[in-house]
């Protein structure tokens, strides 16, 4: 029973701290954090295999196209 009471008090204390911190930081953040899905889509767009590198076993797409003859990326 004591353990449950300690747990409840701890949860209430942590919740109060979260609410207090949220009130203090309102409208002070200049650059808001991007969502993880946005970060993933941006990183996928930015990373590609450059021209001349092998595209045969690469998980990353070519910046241009993958040549079927040479199995390398072509711009």
Swiss-Prot record:
The lineage of its organism: Eukaryota, Metazoa, Spiralia, Lophotrochozoa, Mollusca. Its main location: secreted. This is Conotoxin Bu6. Belongs to the conotoxin O1 superfamily. It is found in: Secreted. The keyword Disulfide bond applies. The modification Valine amide is found at residue 74. InterPro entries: Conotoxin.
């Amino acid at each position: 029973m004591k353990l449950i009471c300690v747990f409840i008090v701890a949860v209430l204390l942590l919740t109060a701290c979260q609410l207090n911190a949220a009130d203090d930081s309102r409208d002070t953040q200049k650059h808001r954090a991007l969502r993880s899905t946005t970060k993933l889509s941006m990183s996928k767009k930015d990373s590609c295999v450059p021209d001349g590198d092998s595209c045969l076993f690469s998980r990353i797409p070519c910046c241009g196209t993958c040549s079927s003859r040479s199995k390398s990326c072509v711009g």
